[in-house]
Amino acid sequence: MGTIKSGDIEKGTFLLFKGMPHIVLEREFSKMGRGGSIVRLKLKNLKNKSVVKETLKGADTVEEIEVLEVASQYLYRENENLIFMDLETYDQFDVNLREISNIEDKVMFLQEAGIYSLVKWDNEVIDLRLPPKVAFEVVDAEIAVKGDTVTNAMKNVTLHTGLVVKAPLFINVGDKILVNSETKEYAERVKE
């Protein structure tokens, strides 16, 4: 663990703030006249899921926590637990959905046998890193109305994990599409 100046904090940085692990969700830097600079942070507590806003002076320092990223294969879901396998040791372990603060919105992106990066701190999983874009198969799509293309027309499509996203009218059942894992929006059709 080391200290980091508030001006060097970036989105996605892991910090030990008030004795608890946090991840930086948003960061805004403001330069004041003679008053120096300030950094506004939106932090998510990785233990109790609370989101707090903090303002730090430019010269302030906070403790950055060292995390370990472990490549793991997602195997299956069992009630409130996600079962993973460590790709180095081949040990299976479970991750409780209630113990990780920001995992609920990522579960729909998990696909069996997919490789994901689990972030560990103090020998405990605190985050799950998804790739920027994830490929899905479309299992249900609304019927497109011909001629309804005056604007950027979109329709709802259901993906094989149950996730529903808006996609262009030309997307049909059986197509594979890429979805942005951060915005949960259609990115592009997979070219085969």
UniProtKB/Swiss-Prot annotation:
Key words of the record: Cytoplasm, Elongation factor, Protein biosynthesis
Family annotation (NCBIfam families): efp, PRK00529.1
GO molecular function: translation elongation factor activity
Keyword Disulfide bond assigned: no
Protein name: Elongation factor P
Entry GO terms, CC: cytoplasm
Entry-linked PANTHER family: ELONGATION FACTOR P, ELONGATION FACTOR P (EF-P) FAMILY PROTEIN
Function: Involved in peptide bond synthesis. Stimulates efficient translation and peptide-bond synthesis on native or reconstituted 70S ribosomes in vitro. Probably functions indirectly by altering the affinity of the ribosome for aminoacyl-tRNA, thus increasing their reactivity as acceptors for peptidyl transferase.
